[in-house]
């Protein structure tokens, strides 16, 4: 969710058709990734796009997702799959989560095919290298936030 994309929102809408309560869990201490937006900004950007989904809450967490799922009494983790390349990583994560908590299920949902190639990293790279044609791939508030990131970077470089 760094940043949230329309692909994420599509998977979230699909999850809402399956579950009465959906928690968007935003990791606050993912030290293996360099993030563009703070956890508070990521939570805010998501919240601004799910206000019409009453069963959705957006929360940050630290530590293992499986521990957070236990704490919130979630029994299912929903993950989006865009391509076969996603499956290997997601399969390993799902298996590890099952090893850590045999009661926790992982289900995979595919987004609409128009979002198969969309990723947060690709969107950021396009913006950081001067591209702007991502209005159909991310919500408007994310576009504005990305423009601010690019402006701040450009101001620091000049």
Where would I find each of the regions flagged by the language model?
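Nucleotidyltransferase catalytic core that binds NTPs
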Residues: 1-158
């Amino acid at each position: 969710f760094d940043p949230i994309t329309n692909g994420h929102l599509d998977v979230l809408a699909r999850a809402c058709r399956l579950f009465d309560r959906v928690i968007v869990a935003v990791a606050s201490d993912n030290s293996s990734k360099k993030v563009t937006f703070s956890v508070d900004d990521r939570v805010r950007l998501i919240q601004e796009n799910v206000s019409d989904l009453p069963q959705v809450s957006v929360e940050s967490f630290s530590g293992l997702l499986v521990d957070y799922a236990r704490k919130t009494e979630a029994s299912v983790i929903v993950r989006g799959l865009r391509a076969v390349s996603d499956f290997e990583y997601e399969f390993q994560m799902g298996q590890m989560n099952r090893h850590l908590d045999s009661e926790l299920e992982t289900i995979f949902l595919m987004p609409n095919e128009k979002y198969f190639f969309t990723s947060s990293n690709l969107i950021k790279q396009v913006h950081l290298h001067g591209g702007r044609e991502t209005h159909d791939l991310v919500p408007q508030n994310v576009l504005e936030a990305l423009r601010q990131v690019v402006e701040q970077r450009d101001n620091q470089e000049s």
